[in-house]
Regions:
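Short histidine-centered beta-strand/loop micro-motifs
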Residues: 30, 50-56, 73, 82-83, ...
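Histidine-centered metal-chelating micro-motifs
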Residues: 49-52, 70, 91, 95-100
Length: 120
């Protein structure tokens, strides 16, 4: 058994490709625990900030902590479906799913991301 506690002031800032007007922070990495497969991040999107539509590299979960995020998912027929998410709402999608998001609210939105990496 292994574990790692991360305090808010220990979150690591990083640049997420295709993201704009956002502060992205990393809370946990797979190497934090024995046999780990989860990457956990917290993103702070300014109004109008978001991420361009792109295929997901991993299975992922978005959980909205505060604010409003419009998540766009592209189906197998290349049709876009938009979902307006608020605090407490979440979306779970598989690897390869084309997705994007945009803060369509008037305040900074906080979104917790969970990325599940396949085991090697």
């Amino acid at each position: 058994m292994s574990y790692k506690v991360t305090y808010a002031n220990e979150a690591t800032k990083y640049e997420a490709p295709g993201h704009f007007d956002v502060l992205t922070t990393r809370l946990h990495n797979p190497a934090d625990v024995n046999g780990g497969t989860i990457v956990n991040g917290l993103s702070h999107f300014l109004p109008g900030g978001g991420a361009n539509i792109a295929p997901a590299n991993f299975e992922m979960i978005y959980y909205i902590i505060s604010g409003e995020m419009t998540v766009t998912l592209v189906d197998e027929n290349e049709q876009e479906q938009k979902y307006v998410l608020h605090a407490g709402d979440s979306v779970h999608f598989g690897k390869g799913t084309k997705r994007g998001c945009l803060n369509t609210g008037i305040v900074t939105a906080q979104m917790l991301t969970v990325m599940i990496k396949p085991q090697a």
